[in-house]
């Protein structure tokens, strides 16, 4: 166990890839509803961020929309009834596909911001933090990445292509739409330090955003989510 206070960074390498991996949804049946939602949204954002990022490519795109469609179809059902075998299988497959996307493309600045939040507030679950900042973060790219956001919305089943509305609907269906950073002690005056921490520890993720967010924008994303 490696512990660095107030720092949550990424890690990886060739040795992290298993020779074989067995993903068995039967082992997930007893995961509590709130953790099912949090981890399901983490998988969703792995896929969606990889699709948004400058590093997106034909290989990562092969898996993105299928992962998102499975989450849109079955995450809420898995949250409501953890013993729903079909829903659990869909979400497990979506999570696996989203992992392919994360590897072939990249996560984006959304993950960098959340890592800073969890570093300073260790009781904040990672997936919950992503949910909390998601609307503020994704709204920054509604003009620069309209086509890709529409494709994600369509994969979620939103016919009009309104990504932010589709995101809000999925969060509401999973019962996580009311989460706020203030629930975990984040204060507006913390925004500057959190933004600086995100940039210094996970700054590479901001560089794959469709456009570079300013320090002030990162601070605004945090304060809007409090």
Regions found by a protein language model. Name each.
Residues 1-58:
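A glycine/threonine-rich phosphate-anchoring loop and its flanking beta-alpha core
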């Amino acid at each position: 166990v490696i512990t660095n206070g107030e720092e949550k960074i990424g890690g990886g390498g060739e040795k992290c890839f298993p020779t074989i991996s067995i993903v068995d949804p039967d082992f997930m049946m007893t995961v509590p509803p709130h953790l099912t939602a949090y981890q399901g949204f983490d998988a969703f954002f792995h896929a969606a961020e990889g699709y948004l990022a400058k590093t997106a490519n034909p290989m990562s795109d092969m898996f993105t929309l299928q992962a998102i469609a499975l989450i849109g179809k079955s995450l809420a059902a898995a949250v409501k009834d953890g013993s729903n075998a079909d829903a659990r299988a869909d979400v497990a497959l979506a999570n696996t596909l989203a992992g392919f996307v994360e590897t072939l493309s990249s996560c984006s600045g959304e993950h960098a911001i959340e890592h800073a939040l969890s570093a300073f507030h260790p009781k904040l679950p990672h997936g919950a933090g992503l949910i909390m900042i998601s609307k503020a973060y994704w709204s920054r790219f509604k003009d620069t990445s309209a086509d890709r956001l529409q494709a994600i919305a369509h994969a979620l089943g939103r016919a009009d292509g309104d990504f932010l509305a589709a995101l809000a609907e999925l969060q509401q269906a999973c019962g996580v739409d009311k989460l706020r950073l203030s629930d975990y002690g984040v204060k507006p005056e913390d925004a500057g330090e959190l933004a600086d921490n995100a940039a210094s520890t996970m700054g590479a993720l901001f560089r794959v955003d469709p456009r570079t967010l300013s320090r002030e924008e990162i601070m605004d994303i945090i304060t809007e989510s409090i």
